[in-house]
């Protein structure tokens, strides 16, 4: 047995399923997960000492690469001053100012400790501000594991939500309405049936939890129009896309202005963090200035703020996002070129520093959850393990996006595409 396999068996004795987040268990691809010992630049190293080019990047935060020297030094400097105070710090103010300077729709921002906390808090705030109970989300979009968000569409887009996890009372789920991503007609129909009860729409502007599905032209703007028409708030969940798709997030890239935005991942530089922010009149409705309660012992943790500020400062380097997008395009289009060369049905998507690939005969643009669920999962599993054997680490699920970092250079990209070519040649 490998050291990772031994550790996995050991972990299952004390940790449910042997992991602290389900996708890490490799249930989507089979086999035992890698246990990671360290990471540096574009590489991770497992417990057996094997090196892999990493396209997971801790699920998105490591946009500059692992163990970046400026971020590491910022953390070490902050540790010298103490780990946590449970009191305001100048670092929190600097982080808020940095976020607001980069995202025009955010006038005030509140720090929390996770993406789930951010979305949960933003929805509570939207409900309190509008005095409405219902929310609208999209099939295939993930916003953390809060009760009201673990809901699926049921038998159709207009079906009232049913819990998709035990432990969620139907009384909670009935207030979550589910529409079809990239389908404005489904959204308008739900609003017309519930014209005065929907507090907000929440969505991933690029759906990164059904692989990587960008919005079709006009979709985000159409949601803005519907929200304005019916008096609902628009919440754009940029926990994944924030500062990864562009310097001002996906909302800046696609030109849409939400009322509230949720953030995480990149703004922590690899440390646990989340945030939600938006219009000042809405944010003033949160305690202590307003009646909607939200609190957190570790919110604005100085270590996380230091790491995040170091990363955010580095992201302001001129040309960085253009270079990141070019790297992403090279990888995604390289996958497609190799697939076409060897007759492997494959579709691709990419935007900013995110990419997706789909083993499917469907060569039309990937725009929906329905298309994703029809992809060939066996081909994905085979490809996944073949890439591991080549020393390339991808997300262990066909429903997760790939992430590029600035640490991926020509050598890593060229090696990756050569490996893809070898694997596709053998799959014919």
UniProtKB/Swiss-Prot annotation:
Q: What is the protein's name according to its record?
A: Glutamate-1-semialdehyde 2,1-aminomutase
Complex formation: Homodimer.
Q: Recorded GO terms, molecular function? A: glutamate-1-semialdehyde 2,1-aminomutase activity; pyridoxal phosphate binding; transaminase activity
- Residues bearing N6-(pyridoxal phosphate)lysine? 265
Q: Which PROSITE patterns match?
A: AA_TRANSFER_CLASS_3
Q: In which pathway does it act?
A: Porphyrin-containing compound metabolism; protoporphyrin-IX biosynthesis; 5-aminolevulinate from L-glutamyl-tRNA(Glu): step 2/2
Entry-linked HAMAP family: HemL_aminotrans_3 (MF_00375)
Q: Which NCBIfam families match?
A: hemL, PRK00062.1
- Protein location: Cytoplasm
CDD domains found in the cross-reference section = OAT_like
The UniProt keyword set, sorted, is: Cytoplasm, Isomerase, Porphyrin biosynthesis, Pyridoxal phosphate
Q: Does the keyword field hold ATP-binding?
A: no
Q: Which cofactor does it need?
A: pyridoxal 5'-phosphate
| Organism of provenance | Shewanella frigidimarina (strain NCIMB 400)
Cellular component GO terms held in the UniProt record: cytoplasm
Primary location recorded for the protein, binned into one broad class: cytoplasm
Q: What protein family is recorded? A: Belongs to the class-III pyridoxal-phosphate-dependent aminotransferase family. HemL subfamily.
């Amino acid at each position: 047995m490998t050291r990772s396999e031994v550790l996995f068996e050991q972990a299952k004795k004390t940790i449910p399923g042997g992991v602290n987040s389900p996708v890490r268990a490799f249930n989507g691809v089979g086999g035992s997960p890698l246990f990671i010992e360290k990471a540096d630049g574009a590489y991770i190293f497992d417990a057996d000492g094997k090196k892999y080019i990493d396209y997971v990047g801790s699920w998105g935060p490591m946009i500059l690469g692992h163990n970046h020297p400026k971020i590491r030094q910022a953390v070490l400097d902050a540790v010298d001053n103490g780990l946590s105070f449970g009191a305001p710090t100048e670092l929190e103010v600097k982080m808020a100012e940095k976020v607001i300077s980069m995202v025009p729709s955010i006038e005030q921002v509140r720090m929390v400790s996770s993406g789930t906390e951010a979305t949960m808090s933003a929805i509570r705030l939207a409900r309190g501000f509008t005095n409405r109970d219902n929310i609208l989300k999209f099939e295939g979009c993930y916003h953390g594991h809060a009760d009201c968000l673990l809901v699926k569409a049921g038998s159709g887009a207009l079906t009232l939500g049913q819990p998709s996890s035990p432990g969620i009372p139907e009384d909670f789920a009935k207030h979550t309405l589910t529409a079809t991503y990239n389908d404005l007609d489904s959204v308008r129909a739900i609003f017309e049936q519930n014209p005065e009860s929907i507090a907000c729409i929440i969505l991933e502007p690029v759906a990164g939890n059904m692989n990587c599905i960008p919005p079709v032209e006009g979709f985000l703007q159409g949601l803005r129009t519907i929200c304005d028409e019916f008096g609902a708030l628009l919440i754009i969940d940029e926990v994944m896309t924030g500062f990864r798709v562009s310097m001002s997030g996906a909302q800046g890239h696609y030109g849409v202005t939400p009322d509230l935005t949720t953030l995480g991942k990149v703004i922590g530089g690899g440390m646990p963090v989340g945030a939600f922010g938006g219009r000042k009149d809405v944010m003033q409705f949160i305690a202590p200035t307003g009646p909607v309660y939200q609190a957190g012992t570790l919110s604005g943790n100085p270590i996380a703020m230091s790491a995040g500020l170091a990363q955010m400062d580095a992201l302001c380097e001129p040309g960085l996002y253009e270079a990141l997008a070019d790297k992403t395009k090279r990888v995604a289009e390289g996958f497609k070129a190799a697939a076409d060369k060897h007759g492997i049905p494959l579709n691709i998507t990419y935007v900013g520093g995110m990419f997706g690939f789909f083993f499917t005969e469907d060569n039309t643009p990937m725009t929906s959850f329905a298309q994703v669920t029809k992809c060939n999962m066996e081909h994905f599993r085979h490809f996944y393990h073949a890439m591991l054997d080549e020393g390339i680490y991808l997300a262990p699920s066909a429903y997760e996006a790939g992430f590029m970092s600035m640490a991926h250079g020509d050598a890593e990209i060229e090696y990756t595409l050569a490996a893809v070519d070898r694997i596709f040649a053998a799959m014919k």
